[in-house]
């Protein structure tokens, strides 16, 4: 495995900022995936680290990175435009390091939603997008759905979703939103919450993240590798 920790420069209205990034690749990867953290976590959160390690075991190179607000150690995300600009810089870096591999944009909760907005605006053009717990709406407030942009995304999308996720209730609303997408699937995690925790099961965050990787890899193989 190869690893690099070179920061990424992001162009923001107030000037360029540098964000931390960790690129790790297995021997002979068949895809490269940028993995964004959620709003309340960082690039080194155990869930994200575990998921990335398991993806590499599946043959996928990974690039974990920080959004500018997290790099500045602020708790609340900045403007969406800053996150979208970060996604643009991250995918450019991933393309430089991936040697012609298919590029995938993925993220936990907020990080995935920002990837979807960047794709909908044409700022990034990944081969596919993967959402780990897409935040359909704030918990208990389904009237504030964050889905109007999803039909504009041309790329295939995979939504990994817990059936007990409070950000997705009622599930019928989430299913209806995904049905408006051009090309999208839901992979349900039975009993899973927003971070895919399951009541009555004690698992470390690294393990929870790692257990999602086989579903992600299988879906990506079906979408990115031509059948013979």
What does each model-found stretch correspond to?
Residues 8-102, 195-204:
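Serine-hydrolase catalytic machinery in alpha/beta-hydrolase-like enzymes
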Residues 48, 146, 155, 168-177:
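Short alpha-helix in the alpha/beta-hydrolase fold that links the catalytic acid
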Residues 87-155:
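Primarily recognizes the serine-hydrolase "nucleophile elbow" in alpha/beta-hydrolase
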């Amino acid at each position: 495995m190869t690893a690099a920790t070179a920061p990424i420069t992001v162009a923001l209205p107030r000037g360029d900022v540098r964000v931390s990034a960790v690129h790790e690749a297995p021997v002979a990867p068949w895809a490269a995936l940028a993995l964004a953290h959620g709003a309340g976590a960082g690039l080194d959160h155990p869930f994200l680290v575990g998921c990335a390690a398991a993806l590499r075991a599946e043959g996928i190179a990974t690039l974990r990175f920080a959004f500018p607000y997290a790099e500045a150690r602020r708790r609340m995300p900045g403007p969406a435009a800053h996150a979208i600009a970060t996604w643009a810089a991250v995918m450019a870096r991933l393309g430089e390091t991936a040697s012609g591999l298919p590029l995938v944009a993925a993220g936990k909760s907020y990080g995935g939603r920002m990837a979807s907005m960047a794709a909908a605006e044409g700022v990034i053009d990944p081969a596919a997008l993967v959402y780990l717990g897409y935040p359909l709406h704030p918990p208990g407030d389904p009237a504030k759905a964050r889905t109007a942009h999803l039909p504009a995304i041309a790329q295939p999308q995979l939504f990994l979703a817990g059936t007990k996720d409070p950000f997705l209730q009622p599930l019928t609303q989430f299913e209806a939103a995904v049905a408006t997408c051009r090309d999208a699937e839901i992979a349900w995690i039975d009993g899973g919450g927003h971070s895919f925790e399951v009541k009555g099961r004690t698992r470390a965050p690294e393990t929870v993240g790692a257990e999602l990787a086989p579903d992600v890899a299988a879906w990506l193989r079906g979408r990115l590798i031509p059948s013979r």
